[in-house]
A protein has these predicted regions:
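Active-site region of glycoside hydrolase catalytic domains
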Residues: 147-248, 253-286, 312-313, 318
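Acidic-and-aromatic substrate-binding clefts and catalytic sites of carbohydrate-active enzymes
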Residues: 70-79, 100-109, 133-144, 173-177, ...
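N-terminal carbohydrate-binding accessory modules
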Residues: 22-94
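An active-site-proximal structural segment forming one wall of the substrate-binding cleft
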Residues: 76-80, 84-94, 99, 104-130, ...
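Acidic/histidine-rich helix-loop elements
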Residues: 56-57, 61-79, 140-141, 240-259, ...
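Bacterial N-terminal signal peptides
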Residues: 8-15
Length: 346
């Protein structure tokens, strides 16, 4: 709702500006320039009825959250509409719905509902596929399985709001890391297949080495991208570290900050060179799954620098992940994590 109200105000102001730009007096302005969008027009924008350009889509993504609503057993069992409403109320603009299961009716029973709930409430849904078999063994058989998965998903959602986008692979890891040519082949074949049913939907590809921005330059733009392509990259997806030089963060020294800004600059340079916008699909304020030895105060400092750096670069991001901040069983925000959450989503 708040998005629709702001949209009406902006368009109304733009109409006045256009009228006065050529010296038109107030009395000469037609009443139509003062009328906001009709309900139908508002709905078309708010619900993504028409295709959305990649740069416009990037500007809409804002700050998001990685969720396992369709990935884990608990995520599926505890999913509910109130969680989506709570996320929107808290300022979360998009969710990255991570999926590892087969594209079948069992998946669609929950995924359909989640996508519709997000669109109706005002959160952008991004479907992201894990494709573990292909990452572990990127042979032809496993490649065909990934293409087939996306064929089914693309057919299922071909008439869905253009706010829905397809994130083709959740970070290249394992054996796939050493075969960038196979990664590019995968993207070429998936995009070709998806474009048969979704010619103007946003498709998102990511570089190797766990979506490292430094390897964006290795990506080959799929021949059927059709002007509706973005790239995902990420860093600190499992949080910072007090001893790993690649993601070191202790007190926020200049060198530690430079590790962050260098990656952002790689992305900005690639965006400028290719005219393809990017998005950070995951970063974590603490090393929750590997020691969890950052205090709340330390997490706040890290989160503040990370958030401000990405916001200043105008690169949207998703935080990893929902269960660290939100109790899905009680539908309550986790009290002791609120200082970190509020630092990011303020």
């Amino acid at each position: 709702m708040k998005r629709k109200i702001v949209l009406c105000i902006i368009i109304t102001l733009m109409s006045f500006h256009a009228a006065f730009a050529d010296g038109t007096e107030l009395s000469q302005v037609t009443i139509s320039s003062q009328i906001p969008l009709s309900t139908k027009e508002q709905n078309e924008v708010a619900y993504g009825v028409n295709p959305i350009s990649p740069w416009e889509y990037q500007s809409k993504l804002g700050k998001g959250m990685d969720v396992d609503w369709s990935k884990t057993k608990k995520g599926k069992e505890n999913y509910n509409l109130k969680a989506v409403q709570d996320f929107e109320d808290a300022g979360i603009d998009h969710v990255r719905i991570r999926i590892k299961d087969k594209a079948d009716n069992d998946l669609f029973m929950t995924l359909d509902e989640q996508i519709d709930d997000c669109i109706n409430i005002g959160i952008i849904p991004i479907i992201a596929y894990q494709a573990d078999e292909f990452k572990n063994n990127p042979n032809e058989e496993n490649l065909q399985k990934v293409v087939a998965w996306w064929r089914v998903v693309a057919e299922r959602y071909k008439d869905k709001s253009y706010l829905l986008s397809f994130d083709l692979l959740i970070e290249a890891t394992d054996a796939l890391n050493k075969q960038p040519e196979k990664l590019n082949e995968l993207y070429e074949r998936i995009v070709t297949e998806v474009r048969k049913t979704n010619p103007q939907r946003i498709i998102i590809i990511s570089p190797r080495l766990r979506s490292d921005a430094q390897y964006l330059s290795e990506l080959k733009i799929p021949s059927q991208a059709n002007g509706y392509l973005m790239a995902e990259w990420h860093f600190y997806a499992a949080g910072p570290s007090k001893d790993n030089d690649r993601k070191l963060w202790t007190i926020g020294t200049e060198n530690e900050k430079k590790l962050i800004t260098d990656k952002i600059n790689y992305a900005l340079e690639w965006q400028k060179k290719t005219n393809i916008p990017t998005w950070v699909g995951a970063w974590m304020p603490g090393n929750y799954n590997d020691g969890d030895d950052y205090s709340i105060e330390e997490q706040v400092v890290f989160a503040e620098f990370m958030t401000s750096s990405l916001v200043n670069a105008q690169i949207p991001f998703a935080v990893n992940s929902d269960t660290k901040f939100y109790d899905r069983e009680t539908n309550n925000w986790i009290d002791n994590m609120l200082p970190v959450f509020n630092t990011i989503f303020k």
